[in-house]
């Protein structure tokens, strides 16, 4: 199935995996709706991509924002073929440090953001009889480690949501979950805990993937034949053990 002519919503599109995915899909002929909070970044990226890109300032933790995003994409493109729920944060910390505000923020962005993204397009996709939901999780959604209990919990939730959606919409909606390992993006900037920051260099002392590696996986999933779906894709740097 060709990506050309597809209409795709991408959240967290202002940088990293989201921006790389937007560029790759647009280069393959897709129409992309870029969603993020940073208007300046969205404008720059849309200008770089050209006429295949539109953008909308969106807070994924707002259900109304996400519903408006879906409606804007449908109005602009006439349809939505796929959504890439990519927005996420990773403020790692030990549970004993009680960074409760960060826990709440992770739940809002990493879990509710995915749910709101699905809700924004699901009725439309079911009415059309086809669609593709791609959720960007993490290898942390397949395990957990010290300091990542809450982050891993949110990513395990994404796995459960994806699997539930797949079973509820089997035969109509394609559902793909991508589990990246270390990727060279801004994700680590959300870590504020001084204990974690002090040891982060030793913990991740290997070369990460480029955002383009994950964008390639998204493109491959969208481009796969209509009668099949890549449900789970795990991508790690060759040196990453966990």
Predicted regions and their residues:
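C-terminal helical subdomain
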Residues: 177-178, 197-241
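Substrate-binding pocket helix/loop in short-chain dehydrogenase/reductase
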Residues: 94-95, 102-107
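The beta1-alpha1 cofactor-binding region of Rossmann-like NAD(H)/NADP(H)-dependent oxidoreductases
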Residues: 57-69, 100
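Residue(s) in the substrate-gating loop at a strand-loop-helix junction
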Residues: 138
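Conserved glycine-rich Rossmann-like NAD(P)H-binding loop of the short-chain dehydrogenase/reductase
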Residues: 28-45
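Conserved glycine-rich cofactor-binding loop
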Residues: 14-15
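Active-site helix of classical SDR
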Residues: 118, 154
């Amino acid at each position: 199935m060709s990506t050309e002519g597809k209409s795709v919503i991408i959240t967290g599109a202002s940088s990293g995996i989201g921006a790389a995915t937007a560029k790759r899909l647009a280069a393959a002929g897709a129409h992309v709706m870029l969603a993020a909070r940073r208007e300046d970044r969205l404008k720059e990226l849309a200008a770089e991509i050209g006429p295949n890109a539109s953008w909308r300032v969106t807070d994924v933790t707002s259900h109304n924002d996400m519903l408006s995003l879906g409606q804007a994409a449908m109005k602009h493109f006439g349809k939505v073929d796929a959504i890439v729920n990519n927005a996420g944060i990773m403020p790692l910390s030990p549970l004993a440090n009680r960074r409760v505000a960060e826990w709440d923020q992770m739940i809002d962005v990493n879990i509710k953001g995915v749910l709101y993204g699905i809700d924004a397009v699901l009725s439309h996709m079911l009415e059309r009889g086809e669609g593709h939901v791609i959720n960007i999780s993490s290898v942390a959604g397949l395990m957990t480690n010290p300091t990542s209990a809450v982050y891993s919990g949110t990513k395990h939730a994404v796995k459960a949501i994806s699997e539930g959606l797949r079973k509820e919409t089997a035969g109509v909606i394609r559902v793909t979950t991508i589990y990246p390992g270390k990727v060279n993006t801004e994700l680590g900037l959300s870590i504020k805990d001084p204990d974690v920051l002090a040891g982060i260099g030793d913990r991740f002392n290997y070369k990460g993937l480029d955002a383009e590696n994950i964008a390639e996986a998204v493109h491959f999933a969208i481009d796969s034949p209509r009668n099949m779906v890549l449900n789970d894709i795990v991508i790690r740097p060759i040196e990453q053990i966990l």
